[in-house]
Amino acid sequence: MNDTERNMVERTSKFLLIVVGSVFFMLILYQYVAPGVINFGSPHGYLLGEEDMTIFPTPDPHYVKKYYFPIKDLERKIDFEIKGEDVIVFLHIQKTGGTTFGRHLVQNVRLELPCDCRPGQKKCTCYRPNRKETWLFSRFSTGWSCGLHADWTELTNCVPGVLNKRESKSKKMRKFYYITLLRDPVSRYLSEWRHVQRGATWKTSLHMCDGRTPTPEELPPCYEGTDWSGCTLQQFMDCPYNLANNRQVRMLADLSLVGCYNLSTVPEKRRSQLLLESAKKNLRDMAFYGLTEFQRKTQYLFERTFHLKFIRPFMQYNSTRAAGVDLDNDTIQRIEELNDLDMKLYDYAKDLFQQRYQYKHMLDRREQRLLRGHASFHSPFREDGAGGEGTARLPTEDYMNHIINGW
């Protein structure tokens, strides 16, 4: 190699070193100036740590609390042992967005051993990482093992026995964590009417209570024939036995307290009071519940409760089958009257939900400030008098957080 060729090689090498060094410098500078935009350690683009807070709405500082809840009702922090004996039980109330949430549970949770969901199959296999036992009891994992859309009364009496049978052994050490979703009662009612109008019946539901199903006299049908397809909203509202009325309270309450479906056991006013208070208590004691109208907040509280992360953030949909229903004020008032217990429960549930979100968000921000202050104190770039909380995050808006009309 002559001197000319040697000089050309040296110049080329120096040029490549300069280019590579410049690229690395720009990457480091870009990450420092705009952290979180490029995230090498976060699969599926899901932001972790402080950046992950930016996808969640800032609590409304002007929110006025309606009910008093002690800290024990606001604090939800479960050491969920997926390798142990813990089981999440999803109580799926019709037309609350439970199908979408149920799919999130089997397809969108970051797990050591993800659920095995195969095309064409209605159920996924959700085994624990260390053995072939399920950690999730839901429609998309175990199927309707306790009956179609089993309620609180059915699930609490059925789930332990079903799992013992499936796993061929009795386990008294299992911990069951019940979860559910609620929805604005008027929107939910209209969505159920639309669903029934298209031919849905849920007539295979068991409604098991105190060891038996209700008699035809206790639970008369609203229609003759195979289904109620084509029914008008007026017909739907006029049936006094319609299980759509106050469905959320009925499915969350302990029906044994009122004689199940036998309406003659307890006077109507007392029955309503017992059902509402029971539903409130059971909802309050659940490990977690979400609201259809607040998808991002629902995601946030679930993740913080169970220490499980979703791969993709939840989306809020406002285009639904119930959205196109034009109602006058009298009809809306009639639906609210038919669902008076659900209206009261939802008002209670929404307030508790918002207070839990505010409380948990406050704890997270406090923890981040402490970590940021600790990092700033030990930072080699720290100057005297500098540090503190750093630049505050701009407030984010709830993603379409208004009451939506359906699911």
From Swiss-Prot:
Q: What sections of the protein cross the membrane?
A: 15-35
- GO CC list: membrane
- Please list the residues that make up the active site: H149 (proton acceptor)
The region annotated as signal peptide is: none
Q: Which residues lie on this side of the membrane: Cytoplasmic?
A: 8-14
GO molecular function: any one? heparan sulfate 6-sulfotransferase activity
Q: Which residues bind substrate?
A: K122, K123, R139, W144, H149, H195, W202
Indicate what this protein is called per its UniProt record: Heparan-sulfate 6-O-sulfotransferase 1-B
Native species: Danio rerio (Zebrafish)
